[in-house]
Structures are given as C-alpha cells and as structure tokens.
C-alpha cells in the first residue's frame, strides 16, 4: 500500500506566528526578570550600606570616617581573597582527581574472563592461606578398575591367506559367510 502524505495539522504560517509569539513572550519574561534582579540588587545594597551623613562633619571626623571605611574594605578584600584562594585550590584538586580517575580508567581494562582449572589443593591453599598444608587427593579414594583385555578373549586365527581366499570364492564362500553371521546370534 502506498503511503498517503499526511497534511500537517498546523500550517507553516500558523507555526511561524506561534513561534514569534513564544519568542516575544520569552523576551518579555527575560526583561521582567532583569528588572527584578536590578531592584533586588538596589534593595540589598540599601540594607547593607548605611547612608553617610557627611554634612556638618569636621575635617578630623571625615578622616576618621574614611579610615574606618578603608579598614572595612581591607577586611572584606582579605576575606574575598581567602575565599578565592580556597576555591582555586579546590578546583585544582578536583581537576587533578579527575585526571587520576581518567588515567586509572585507561590503565586497567578488564580482560575477558576465562575458565581456569583449579585443583582442590590449590583452592584450599587459596582459602586457608599458605601456612596451612592440607592435601586433598580425591583420586586416592577412587576404586581401581582394570581394563579388560578384549583381544585376549577372542583368539585370532592366523592361517594361510591363500586358503581363506580359495575357500571364500564362489557361491560356497558366500554361503559360509552367511552361516558364520547367523551362528553367533543363535548361540
């Protein structure tokens, strides 16, 4: 069956209109967030920084005020420097640890596992340690079985081969072979 082309549920012009509306809404939200951030920044600074009353202060009072402000700025700068140093140290340490992890991943590839034959003695040595000397000869408990000599039971007749060939030739030879094949089953 040939596939029928489906018409899109929404036309291209409608899609473009919706996209432009979404972009306009996103821009409006972004501008609103930006204004809120600026307002929050102004509010925070107003809370943290007290207004200075410099009117009516003498020269020595202004100099004392400047010294206090400079001392506060130095303390804040020292704290900022310490925090930056700690951050830099931590980022370097993280980077070094990441490199070590990458190195270790590259070095140790897991080999494909193979079956290994382990004797009972080797397994006990691995489990108990090398100090304990335990031998487990499992073959010692097995019964010994002698192989039966099948060749001794059947005596092989060795004769003149020419007589065998002459005896087996012709119809009588075939009859002898047929009778010989019958005789072991009948016994």
From Swiss-Prot:
The keyword Acetylation applies. Keywords: Acetylation, Actin-binding, Muscle protein, Phosphoprotein. Residues 97-118 are annotated as: Involved in binding TNC and actin. The modification N-acetylproline is found at residue 2. GO terms for cellular component: cytosol; troponin complex. It holds the Pfam family Troponin. Highest levels observed in human skeletal muscle (e.g. gastrocnemious muscle), differentiated cultures of primary human muscle cells and rhabdomyosarcoma cells cultured in low serum medium. Expressed in C2 muscle cell myoblasts and myotubes. It comes from the Eukaryota. GO terms for molecular function: actin binding. The modification Phosphoserine is found at residue 58. Residues 2-48 are annotated as: Involved in binding TNC. One of its GO terms (biological process) is cardiac muscle contraction. Troponin I is the inhibitory subunit of troponin, the thin filament regulatory complex which confers calcium-sensitivity to striated muscle actomyosin ATPase activity. Belongs to the troponin I family. Binds to actin and tropomyosin. This is Troponin I, slow skeletal muscle. The lineage of its organism: Eukaryota, Metazoa, Chordata, Craniata, Vertebrata. The gene is TNNI1.
């Amino acid at each position: 069956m040939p596939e029928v082309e489906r018409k899109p549920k929404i036309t291209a012009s409608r899609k473009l209109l919706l996209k432009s509306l979404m972009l306009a809404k996103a821009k409006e939200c972004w501008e609103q967030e930006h204004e809120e951030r600026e307002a929050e920044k102004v509010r925070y600074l107003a809370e943290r920084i007290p207004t200075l009353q410099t009117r009516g202060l003498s020269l020595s009072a202004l100099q004392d005020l400047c010294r206090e402000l400079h001392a506060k700025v130095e303390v804040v700068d020292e704290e900022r420097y310490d925090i930056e140093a700690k951050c830099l140290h931590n980022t370097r340490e993280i980077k070094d640890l990441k490199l070590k992890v990458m190195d270790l991943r590259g070095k140790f590839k897991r080999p494909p596992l193979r079956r290994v034959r382990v004797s009972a003695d080797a397994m006990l040595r691995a489990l108990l340690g090398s100090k304990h000397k335990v031998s487990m000869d499992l073959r010692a408990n097995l019964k010994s079985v002698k192989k039966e000599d099948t060749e001794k039971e059947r005596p092989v007749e060795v004769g003149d081969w020419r007589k065998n060939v002459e005896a087996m030739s012709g119809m009588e030879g075939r009859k002898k072979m047929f009778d010989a094949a019958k005789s072991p089953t009948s016994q």
